[in-house]
Amino acid sequence: MSNQHRQILVTCALPYANGPIHLGHMLEHIQADIWVRFQRMRGNEIHFVCADDAHGTPIMLKADQMGITPEQLIADVKEKHYADFCGFNISFDNYHSTHSEENRELSELIYSRLKENGFIKSRTISQLFDPEKSMFLPDRFVKGTCPKCKAEDQYGDNCEVCSATYSPTELINPRSAVSGATPVIKESEHFFFDLPSFESMLKEWNRSGALQSEVANKMQEWFDAGLQQWDISRDAPYFGFKIPGTENKYFYVWLDAPIGYMASFKNLCKRENLDFDRFWNKDSNTELYHFIGKDIMYFHSLFWPAMLDGANYRKPTNIFVHGYVTVNGEKMSKSRGTFIQAATYLKHLDPECLRYYYAAKLSNRIDDLDLNLDDFVQRVNTDLVNKLVNLASRNAGFIQKRFDGKLADKLEDESLFAEFIAQSEQIAAYYENREFGKAIREIMALTDKANKYVDDKAPWVIAKEEGREAELQAVCSMGIQLFRVLMGYLKPVLPKLAERSEAFLQAELTWDNLAQPLLNHGIAPFKALFSRLDVKQIDAMIEASKAENAAVNATVKKEEKNSKKSTALLTDFEPIEPEISIDDFAKIDLRVAKVIKCEEVPESKKLLKFQLDLGFEQRQVLSGIKGAYNNPEELEGRFVIVVANLAPRKMKFGVSEGMILSAGTGGEDLYLLDVDAGVKAGSRVM
């Protein structure tokens, strides 16, 4: 594909408007921003848009819990999101909201076209209904016992213990996660998008090169299982757009969310007098790219292109999918302080450090990326401070002091300069293909060559010898020329460092002008371009993150407590189980155990892994109380009560050799049973 005169529209996935941006979000936005900045440097017409995903039940409920309107909540969150992105130098041309008139108009238009073309069906379905809140419950707002493995406190769509999927109506003893009430089953008419009608088109499009091979292979699993009609409606009360021609039906958030890409661009078109249809018409020859995470790839690879096709719009040119971010080899953890919010990072560290580190580890595959904090410090200090910036500083002083800031009028080593310029197209190809890690390795290899050149020439030795002034100027100028080329190559990754370098060089860095050296050119006095990272900064950030997450958890619990009724109703309690005999009870062997070690099970949202001392032996027990204990290590040393003669059970995440007793309704409302001081591990509960 030609690199000239391309017309490109780029989007990032829309962050949900009910919580802060964290470093996991930033991977995608940094990846997209680097690609966009590179395209701008190449002279292409490119538009970069995003928006907040601002509809849905979670937003409605959170606003109610906070005592504000959903509109107030999403406005506050959007302001914070945009500030975080600006802090990381994400160069959006427009940042909008799905709760906008542009999105309402486009959602209604696409729905009407799909309906006219026969792709909208309706039928009556059975749903769980909260009688206290008078609302139908989405899958994730119902909890109960898994119908397959009987694990308690599972969501309404899948079990996190045995991985089974099911309907909310199949849950045993279901309860509303909103009010705690027992839901009832009610019927309601819903509207469905006829996804199976697009199977042939989707199969062809999925294998057309529009998706990474790993994504296309994953989508094949959906085709093998058979595509199903997609429920695009929700019942009132719901925060979103009402479906035209209905009284109490709303578009499901995942219908209007991707349309938010179009809405944000349409808002930009109004502001800058751009042609919206040129980018979205079915016969458009412009390019459209979505950067997204692997958790939402099926929406973008199946539902979204089918919606566009059915509504007579163009499909994406390509969807670029990335993996998750881990920290120090583990899932981001609030208790360990590695669930780091973007705003917390910005209070302690330069955003360009993270931009560089992510770029150095990014490829065009969907592998997860590990933010190893020790490696992070070492790589930034070695590559950016010791090698790159030092290349400029070790030469600039001589140019400023001995030659009044004037560079030599010719290159000292034309072949070396030519070698650096010759790598331009290879580095450009890496950027184009999102192989940022390969681009960084190539650039740093050139940086090593530049520093070796200076080391071999030893300008500090030349400076001490009379009659070698011209040679000194030529050598130091050559070092500056090479630094300029390197900074040009790194400009998409490090825009602020590039900006400071441009001020020092007194010249703009563009991809095309790098081949023309700055001969007989004046540069500004050198000032520090980049600061070294200190481990103490990392430690301070982690501690701040721990404190902030703890404060948020405390606030959430307080809000939830205040939102509940002040007096308990009899219906709040589970009924007493059928009577058993004393002989039945005698079969249960309850023992006191001491917690030796307690840690999260990273792959599970519910489980903690305990290593217990029963006095006579040690055992491993998996317990679904993660929601109640954010700092599992704090449980170490505590005594708990265990069902000791329960048969070992093989679970998805390991073998559990017993059951720890706790009381409560589930989730965060769980409390471990305690024992008086003096009891020993292994003591039997009588």
Swiss-Prot record:
Alphabetical list of CDD domains matching this protein: Anticodon_Ia_Met, MetRS_core, tRNA_bind_EcMetRS_like
Swiss-Prot/TrEMBL catalytic activity: tRNA(Met) + L-methionine + ATP = L-methionyl-tRNA(Met) + AMP + diphosphate
Keyword Protein biosynthesis: yes
Residues the record lists as binding Zn(2+): 146, 149, 159, 162
Known EC number: 6.1.1.10
Cofactor note: Binds 1 zinc ion per subunit.
Cofactor(s) needed for function: Zn(2+)
Family: Belongs to the class-I aminoacyl-tRNA synthetase family. MetG type 1 subfamily.
Name this protein carries in UniProt: Methionine--tRNA ligase
Encoding gene, per UniProt annotation: metG
